[in-house]
Design a protein with these regions (language model features):
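Face-selective signature of the C-terminal outer-membrane beta-barrel domain
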Residues: 326-344, 372-557, 567, 574, ...
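Outer-membrane beta-barrel translocator domains and adjoining extracellular loop/strand segments
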Residues: 92, 209-210, 273-279, 347-363, ...
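Conserved C-terminal beta-signal and adjacent last beta-strands/turns
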Residues: 724-743, 751, 755-854
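Short, acidic Ser/Thr/Gly-rich low-complexity loop/linker segments typical of extracellular
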Residues: 49-63
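A short, solvent-exposed loop/turn motif at the edges and junctions
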Residues: 48-51, 71-90
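Short, ordered, surface-exposed loop/turn motifs in non-cytosolic proteins
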Residues: 33-47
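Membrane-proximal, glycine/serine-rich, low-complexity loop/turn segments characteristic
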Residues: 20-22, 61-63, 83-96, 116-403, ...
């Protein structure tokens, strides 16, 4: 036994040193710029001869641990490598814990082009590194999106990618804002976003991922880890002269499972916050046009110049509340609820000269118009969606009410006081179910909508004129689609049934016009639409032929049966990873819009009457379009160009009768031909030499149409061209320049006259950062308007903004319209008339505000 104890003791003495010498070398590997952990990076310890002694792989959290034998490692080197990053190494010395930063690098594989410093691309996803495009003066993700090549942010906030409008706007794959993504772009801090993904050929239903149907384009914001699952946002408190205020609160809790956003805003500073509640995604906008829905008949909107920012002309008091929540109720299902309310009161003051080009003369009416438009809107919706692997189901219920009141006082060549009430109330239900059956798909969709549109107009001018309109409509649509997939081919049958039942009651009475108009009629139809489609898809080629056949039965105001036939061919070809072609061609007849038809004339404003009787003839159409796009992700170059043609011929003519102070519009049987051409192109490139981006855009519309004015048929042409070039450069850390140059041409021509306007615009923003937390921005805008028969008009605006950041608080002072410009002139063309308008502008204002970020 003594020998056994001695043997055990002897062995412990031998092996204990080896156990004691096991030493752990650990650490964390992260990505430069974003701070995100790098997964599956290879970590090695090498000796002086570069021989690998120990190796390991980082975890999802970017962590690693290597166990050594305890030898002297001070002269050894630790090395880290990972695809898409530059290798990193450092001497070990006496360290045992390491924080290693990997710098992204560019590499190329088949169909994969990556420049991870700024832009990466894989298959259908293009990713933008937010830190690669942001600067010290940027606050929101919208500020950074404008600097990303290939992404265009329009004046109204809508986002497009290389010429294509986005279908959805997501945060961590969740559609929290339901198309109202101005809330996200104008309020979410860019510091919370690691990268922006643009995903093409995207299907919102997982079961459709491998289908041959054409997907959409979505934008997805990827959150940094620090932003997930916690409340973040900003609060703003501002006041200034003359008697202006601006108060805002935005708070959001964002993650991949549960999301909430709360927006509360109020101001009278001219800042447009109403647009944050506008639906901007292509999918939602197209959904609004699926059914033939009635629109407001009375003209209640206020005129504003399209070239100016709304802050120049808005003289409004606005309140806005928007609350949205997405709650995950199971592994695949969510419940999305939303409610928003807006209350806006805007004052418009304009001087207007309308010229009517008649056969033997030109009739001009000059007036001053002062109007107060009040708008209130309430919308509430709830959506249940189950996006599983075996099926997709969604059901949405939505209620909305819109109340509008416009009081307008007109003086000049004719004088009156008019008050318009125009409301819309609706309840809408949309249901969708998709079920894969083997390689095939069955889709069922249903939509039911009921709405009422009460409208009133009262005009006082040497007597009183009253117009009352009440409309109701019920729309029901059921759609059934079955798709057979056969390797490269797919064949589908789409069957749709639509029922529309509507009623209109209108009554016009006047003291000074010895006429009354009354109508109480129903406009109903039942339609069956069958559309077989054949799709071919192989590698980068996709071709689809649709042959829809529509049968309509009308009763009520007009009784008839009609058949419409509009075949369409779409072809797209991904020629290479950089070039893509697309063409579209359709030819046939389409059903007329009847839910906005009425026989008795309706007074739409204080000087216009309109009637829209149903003409029992359909319109023959030809449409064609061709587009080409180029993307070079490595060199950050994006370009696209497209041209479209349309030709239409129907058996109805638009008629216009100008008499004294009134204008009458209607329709009558006849032959009418219209032609149009659209040209669109854009180019954007990131240039590292200037630390910025250059861009160029061109948009042109060339249209020909015919109108029957005062009994004479007149062919006329309207042309519109908009071109612009821009430069954004972060010249130094302390200096950023943004310059835009634009040139627009609008013209109207017919046999007896030709007139046009030209507009040259320049906008320059210069931001100075003398110290890290102080930003001084000087903004200047120049508008040069050139008119055919009037002197040119030059207008210069200037704004100054100073911002100082103290920890998480911005102290901001802004001086708007420094030169105190009073008015702005603009001309627009409508059929055979032109409107020369002088708009009253907001005067000079000063606003001091505190913005706290959390």
């Amino acid at each position: 036994m003594r020998r056994l104890y001695c043997l055990i003791f002897f062995m412990l003495i031998i092996f204990m040193p080896s156990f004691a010498q096991k030493v752990a070398v650990d650490g964390y590997v992260y990505e430069q710029g974003t701070g995100n952990p790098v997964n599956k990076a290879i970590v090695t310890i090498c000796n002086q001869k570069s021989n690998i002694l120990y190796s390991g792989i980082t975890s999802k959290e970017g962590k690693f641990q290597l166990l050594t034998k305890g030898e002297d490692l001070s002269l050894y080197t630790i090395k880290v490598s990972c695809m898409g990053y530059k290798p990193a190494s450092c001497a070990i010395g006496n360290q045992k814990n390491f924080q290693i930063e990997l710098e992204p690098k560019a590499f190329a594989l088949k169909d994969v082009y990556v420049k991870a410093e700024k832009i990466s691309h894989h298959n259908d996803t293009t990713s933008y590194l937010v830190s690669g495009f942001s600067s010290a003066k940027d606050r929101t993700i919208g500020d950074v999106l404008r600097k990303m090549p290939g992404i265009e942010v329009a004046k109204n906030g809508s986002v497009s990618y290389n010429g294509k409008a986005i279908n959805e706007f997501l945060v961590e794959g969740v559609d929290l804002f339901d198309g109202q993504y101005n809330i996200a772009t104008r309020n979410i801090s860019h510091d919370l976003i690691s990268k922006v993904d643009i995903i093409e050929n995207y299907h919102s239903a997982k079961v459709m991922k491998n289908s041959k149907s054409e997907g959409g384009t979505v934008l997805n914001l990827n959150l940094k880890d620090k932003a997930k699952g916690r409340w973040s946002g900003n609060a703003k408190l501002g006041g200034g002269a003359p008697s202006i205020w601006e108060e805002e609160l935005f708070a959001a809790k964002l993650s991949a499972t549960n999301q909430t956003a709360i927006t509360l805003k109020t101001n009278n500073s001219g800042k447009d916050i109403l647009s944050e509640n506008k639906i901007l995604t292509l999918e939602d906008l197209l959904g609004q046009d699926v059914l033939d829905e009635p629109k407001n008949i009375l003209e209640i909107s206020q005129e504003k110049p399209g070239s100016l920012d709304d802050k120049r002309t808005r003289n409004a008091r606005t309140h806005m509340v928007n609350i949205s929540n997405v709650q995950k109720v199971s592994d695949t299902a969510i419940l999305h609820s939303k409610i928003y309310y807006t209350d806006d009161r805007n004052i418009s003051d304009i001087e207007k000269g309308v010229s009517y080009f008649l056969a033997d003369s030109t009739l001009t009416k000059n007036t001053k118009e002062y109007s107060i438009l009040g708008t209130k809107e309430l919308v509430a919706s709830v959506l249940y969606k189950n996006d599983g692997k075996k099926s997709f189901f969604s059901d949405e219920l939505k209620y909305s009410s819109l109340w509008q009141r416009n009081q307008t006082k007109i003086s000049g060549d004719y004088s009156n006081l008019s008050v318009i009430h125009s409301d819309v109330h609706s309840i809408d239900n949309k249901l969708k179910w998709i079920r894969p059956i083997g390689k095939h798909y069955l889709t069922v969709e249903s939509r039911n909508k009921f709405q009422t549109l009460p409208e009133k107009l009262c005009v006082e001018a040497d007597g009183q004129s009253l117009q009352d309109v009440k409309r109701k409509q019920f729309l029901s649509m059921t759609k059934l689609n079955y798709t057979w997939n056969m390797k490269r081919w797919a064949f589908s049958i789409d069957t749709k049934g639509i029922l529309s039942v509507s009623n209109i009651k209108s009554n016009f009475m006047s003291d000074n016009i010895d006429t009354t108009f009354y109508e109480n009629s129903s406009i109903n139809y039942l339609s069956l639409i069958v559309c077989p489609s054949l799709i071919y898809k192989f590698k980068g080629i996709r071709s689809e032929i649709q042959v829809p056949l529509s049968v309509y039965h009308y009763w009520g105001l007009s009784s008839s049966d009609r058949v419409f036939y509009l075949p369409e061919w779409t072809f797209s070809w991904q020629v290479s990873s950089r070039w893509k072609l697309r063409t579209n061609l359709s030819l046939g007849s389409t059903a007329p819009s009847v839910n906005n038809s009425y026989v008795a004339p309706i007074m739409t404003d204080s000087k216009t009457f309109s009637s829209s009787p149903i003409i029992n003839y359909w319109e023959n159409k030809q449409n064609s379009a061709f587009s080409i796009s180029y993307t070079d992700y490595t060199h950050m170059l994006f370009g696209n160009a497209s041209v479209g043609f349309n030709w239409g011929k129907d058996k109805s003519n638009t008629t216009k009768w100008v008499e004294r102070d009134l204008v009458f519009y209607s329709k009558e049987k006849g032959n009418n031909t219209s032609r149009g051409t659209m040209i669109l192109g854009s180019l954007s490139k990131r240039i590292e030499g200037i630390r910025g981006m250059v861009n160029a855009k061109c948009l042109g519309f060339l249209n020909r149409a015919t109108i029957l004015q005062n009994g004479e048929s007149v062919d006329y042409k309207t042309n519109m061209w908009q071109t612009s070039v821009g430069l954004n450069s972060n010249v130094h850390d302390w200096l950023e320049i943004d310059y835009q140059l634009g040139y627009n041409i609008n013209s109207l021509s017919f046999s007896k006259a030709k007139t046009s306007t030209k507009l040259l615009t320049q906008a320059l923003n210069i931001s100075f950062l003398p110290i890290e937390d102080l930003t001084l921005t000087v903004m200047a805008e120049h508008y040069a308007n050139y008119f055919s028969s009037l002197p040119s008009k030059q207008t210069i605006f200037s704004d100054i903004k100073c911002s100082y950041r103290y920890r998480k608080i911005d102290i901001v002072g802004s001086l708007t319209n420094v030169f105190n410009q009073k008015d702005y002139n603009n001309t627009v063309y409508t059929d055979l008339s032109s409107s020369y308008t002088r708009y009253a502008l907001r005067g000079r204002t000063f606003l001091l505000s505190l913005v706290a970020y959390f």
